[in-house]
């Protein structure tokens, strides 16, 4: 399953966030299964201190590890995302 993670932080925490991001990337190299696999991103929303990242096959433990790594500076919200064609297929089966 894929998840989109919306994140945001305060401008005054930007230096801390850069350091935490570097630590997370190094951690991914050493222990790849600690955090969810990045499918694409992170992307920031223009002119704002927030953005999103899409993760693939994220387990609850990996999501928790990621949240705890960036806490308290960053707020995160994980939302499952579905392929439109698959969603329609399941919906049509349910209608029968």
Question: Could you tell me what each predicted segment is?
Answer:
Residues 50-52, 75:
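Short active-site oxyanion
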Residues 24, 63-72:
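Short amphipathic alpha-helices in soluble, non-transmembrane regions
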Residues 73-84:
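Conserved short beta-strand edge segments in small beta-sheet-based binding/regulatory domains
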Residues 1-50, 58-62, 83-96:
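Short S/T/G/P-rich N-terminal loop/turn motif that feeds into the first structured element of a domain
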